[in-house]
């Protein structure tokens, strides 16, 4: 796990956005397993990454369809495990329709913290080689943040994890 810590506007997001090639470097290189990302097909690069942006994104559909986005062949058990790691399973299970609960476009019918946890679970369900969390824990309360980081550490030992944050927690 690598943490990129700094104040607002210090370039943390710009730095990690070079990995999925949202921007290309103007000099030097960004390498994944020794290969310059500019030499990789975007599809291949994206398949290796799980990215959770600062502003969590949810799509109209259900909780289940949102968690499967990018990993449609995930088993029910894998989806449930990802939700558990992301500390989302408790609030999902409290909903009447559970994983079949409808999600409005943009996730307007869930709280900010729930939206972040669902976005995190979606990235985890993909089982990528590299997980990037770009200030993705900011809407979480302290207790949830601690539990999520602990579960993440235990479950993603073989994954390169990059966490962008404004403060150490």
Label for each model-derived stretch:
Residues 1-169:
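ABC-type nucleotide-binding domain
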């Amino acid at each position: 796990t690598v943490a990129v810590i700094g104040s607002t506007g210090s370039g943390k997001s710009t730095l990690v956005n070079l990995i999925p090639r949202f921007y290309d470097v103007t000099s030097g290189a960004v390498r994944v397993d020794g290969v310059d990302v500019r030499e990789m097909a975007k599809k291949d690069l994206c398949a290796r990454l799980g990215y959770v942006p600062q502003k969590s994104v949810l799509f109209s559909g259900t909780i289940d369809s949102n968690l499967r986005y990018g990993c449609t062949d995930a088993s029910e058990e894998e989806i449930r495990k990802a939700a558990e790691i992301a500390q989302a399973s408790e609030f999902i299970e409290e909903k009447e329709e559970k994983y079949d609960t409808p999600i409005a476009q943009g996730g307007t019918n869930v709280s900010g913290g729930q939206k972040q946890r669902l976005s995190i679970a979606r990235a985890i369900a993909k089982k990528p080689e590299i997980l990037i969390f770009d200030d993705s824990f900011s809407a979480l309360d302290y207790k949830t943040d601690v539990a999520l980081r602990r579960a993440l550490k235990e479950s993603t030992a073989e994954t390169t994890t990059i966490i962008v944050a404004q403060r150490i927690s």
